[in-house]
């Protein structure tokens, strides 16, 4: 990867390590993610992440792909896989909530501004046939002007590439939809909008809504907050692998979500409760949420015009030790 001058490490996770680097050809500062090898993050995962990023190119609230590169190691030993993306100089939304605001709730108008950006990006992502499958404040970067960028597509999936069953579990536990916790492998992009509902609640409360310690604890927290009657009436509920254990665990109170957000406007609560509908078929899509009165009748104008994602065919660069090719 001689084309890129490494400037320092900015993050590391189960899938790989991310460095900030300078593109020697263009002078641009970029983020370079090197996927770990040998722990389930090989060439298939690299290609899937790059294809998802490529499908979502051109939207202001989705991190932009610059290049994807597979470099064969000298002397054999397999390949190193890299994804090169735009670099956003700013903290994660999680850090803003936790450190800069120190757990203080966002005012409703500011929460609406941020949620509009996230919903706009996710609506475009879903229109491009991509599920993110790990939406959380850690995977949202806040730019210098307060604009949000959704990043880390390492768990993403192009839905057009194949029908269910999909991998389970996916999504970080605190933001995981109930159907996923109950073992569903026939989920769809609505798992992302549940995660957005969790993020919206976190903005309004200043802390995670469902900070579960285990899958069962997480499920209990969800059903104790939003109730279980809605989920039990879903035709697909009985087919879920863990449905019986959820029913037998204990009695569930009715939803108390409204009690937890008494100052939220009726229009805002319609969005929050719609995103946090336990029944997937009653959950708001991102596009539907943007059509709710909370956004359409807001005093302040939209901060971003919806942009259609690109749909150009992705062709990865596969080479020996040559530079990455921008796609």
From Swiss-Prot:
The broad enzyme category this protein falls into is transferase
E.C. numbers: 2.7.11.22, 2.7.11.23
Pfam families in the cross-refs: Pkinase
Q: Which superkingdom does the taxonomy of this entry point to?
A: Eukaryota
Q: Which keywords fit this entry according to its UniProt record? A: ATP-binding, Kinase, Nucleotide-binding, Phosphoprotein, Serine/threonine-protein kinase, Transferase
PROSITE patterns tied to this protein = PROTEIN_KINASE_DOM, PROTEIN_KINASE_ST
Where do the Protein kinase domain residues begin and end? 4-295
- Where does the record place the catalytic residues? 134 (proton acceptor)
Task: Please write the reaction equations for the catalytic activity of this protein.
Answer: L-seryl-[protein] + ATP = O-phospho-L-seryl-[protein] + ADP + H(+); L-threonyl-[protein] + ATP = O-phospho-L-threonyl-[protein] + ADP + H(+); [DNA-directed RNA polymerase] + ATP = phospho-[DNA-directed RNA polymerase] + ADP + H(+)
Instruction: Look up the record and report any one GO term of the cellular component aspect.
Output: nucleus
Q: Where does ATP bind?
A: 10-18, 33
InterPro entries for the chain? CDK, CDK20-like_STKc, Kinase-like_dom_sf, Prot_kinase_dom, Ser/Thr_kinase_AS
Quote the protein name from its UniProt record.
Answer: Putative cyclin-dependent kinase F-2
The species this protein belongs to is Oryza sativa subsp. japonica
> Lineage of the source organism?
Eukaryota, Viridiplantae, Streptophyta, Embryophyta, Tracheophyta
